[in-house]
């Protein structure tokens, strides 16, 4: 196919892998590094020309990665940033932090994306090559990862921050020889793949640790810390533990305690790599925002918060920070300020200025769904204590939610709950219908109209809300 636009790039990448060859969530045998290594060999190993910082964890890895890319580019080097998933735009997966750019992170030029795809296509023009030695085509994520390395190489990027997709040990990104390994907050997740025990999960995340390479880890539970220490000792890697930074005067655009913690971790790593993190460099990074991290828009006179929180701890923090997020509404963010959808925040600013001071007095609603392999029960148990209305919906696409399971487990959690605030449960497969039902809600237990609606549980859910 002819690749002449970024849309063509996406069509090429998504048309190259075989959907039938995607790894089964239940079949960990298909998670292996051999396919990625073989694919990169066909592409002349572009990853070997990059100095990479590898980031893994359960939550905060995207924010930490973005902060780190911005701080390193403050040292005058162009930095590539590979993250997943995207929320609004595929280009969020492959970004740039340019010391000469206006924003801390931005998209590459479309010509760069197109050139990288054309180069990739020239190496892989015979699709039969993509039936690799095990007879299975590369997965979508494996192709996206390989494309990132090709893009960075031909855009003359020398340093890249690489975020894992899932786990660490068998993640497609774990083909790199990193200069530093970063471990953010670790908790139970993906138990069907990574294991049901926090120690086992931590060991999987620690799989990114390379021999003799320094490791920077956020302090966790004693069990988590112990595993990290043992894995670093085994690999002969120096370990630097970082404390949670819950109070900070840094005027970060992303609000919440974890943002300060992620920023502090990124500064620690950057300084160890020889980057001068003075106030000038930090000030350049403070305005950085990412989609669906406490992001706000308006639906009529209601404030809608989009947040991709998908673990129990991140849901707890989101609930804690709802008021703070609303009181710090920003009219623009780095990535999406060009979108007409986001301009509604400015157009309707007057509508909610009177609401903000009284925000805690109004009923709150949450539209929630999560992927099948997430801790739905743990997250839902938090939400019933914090919201008056909960709307349960579904996620479509390759990564889906199990609506039947969610509804069944909802009843179990509600029956067992000793304490709850929720007064109304709405169930609908369509997120827009959930929103409409909340807006037209008539419930004797809820006297005032809902003024704050939170959409959370998955980045994929946030994406579906705005048609990403």
Enumerate the predicted regions with their spans.
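Active-site-proximal loop/hinge segments that shape catalytic or ion-binding/gating pockets
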Residues: 458
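Short, high-confidence coil segments that cap the C-terminus of an alpha-helix
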Residues: 156-158, 361, 448-450
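Nucleotide phosphate-binding/pyrophosphate-handling subdomain across enzymes
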Residues: 159-164, 171-182, 187-190, 200, ...
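N-terminal phosphate/diphosphate-binding loop that engages ATP/GTP or pyrophosphate donors
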Residues: 66-123
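Short functional linear segments
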Residues: 1-57, 64-75, 82, 101, ...
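C-terminal helical cap/extension that packs against the catalytic core
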Residues: 221-240, 339, 347, 380-452
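Acidic, Mg2+-coordinating active-site environments of NTP-dependent enzymes
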Residues: 50, 127-133, 155-163, 178-280
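Phosphate-binding/switch loop-helix module in NTP-utilizing enzymes
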Residues: 119-166
